[in-house]
Swiss-Prot record:
Pfam families: CoaE. It catalyses: 3'-dephospho-CoA + ATP = ADP + CoA + H(+). Keywords: ATP-binding, Coenzyme A biosynthesis, Cytoplasm, Kinase, Nucleotide-binding, Transferase. This is Dephospho-CoA kinase. It is an enzyme of class 2 (transferase). It comes from Bacillus cereus (strain ZK / E33L). It comes from the Bacteria. Residues 4-200 form the DPCK domain. Catalyzes the phosphorylation of the 3'-hydroxyl group of dephosphocoenzyme A to form coenzyme A. Gene3D superfamilies: P-loop containing nucleotide triphosphate hydrolases. PANTHER family: BIFUNCTIONAL COENZYME A SYNTHASE-RELATED, DEPHOSPHO-COA KINASE-RELATED. GO terms for biological process: coenzyme A biosynthetic process. NCBIfam families: dephospho-CoA kinase. Belongs to the CoaE family.
Amino acid sequence: MTVVIGLTGGIASGKSTVSQMFRELSIPVIDADIIAREVVEKGKPAYNKIVEVFGTEVLQEDGELDRPKLGSVVFHNEEKRLQLNKIVHPAVHEEMNRQKEMYIKEGMQAVVLDIPLLFESKLTSLVDRVLVVAVKPHTQLERLMKRNNFSEEEATARIQSQMSLEEKVKNADEVINNDGTIMGTKTQLQAILKKWNIID
């Protein structure tokens, strides 16, 4: 039986590090962010719907989606953000499901759905187990400021726009504390996978 693991965490909690560790263990990872980019490529159904709803001003000169422009349109407008999610989320959901079923058919021991907004998008029904990568609030703030060149205000606003890490931790089957070393994170992951009988 393939175990479907939902991998999530707060912004800048180091989820991609853990995602990479799964890959090193030969466990396939389906990345929602990559799929979200693919489903809105020029000519795809979700792309056509976005152009229909938001107009051609959210396109680059070559006709591809201008992500930063679309991002700023929806970031300050709740109604538009919901409209965009209504187009993109089902398309991402469908493609993730398709890939998941493919790995299950292949008889994989486990498959990981890497979904930053697993709880916010109410996608927990797609997975059997939820693994949350968590860090202390000050670590999260520092990492985000450094990674995205954000001011403290910008970073705080971005963190607050998501469900709190505390809340995610409460709803997790297992939690990896990613404040320490990479080795420490790896040890925690291996212990969890042994507990779930995914690795020996």
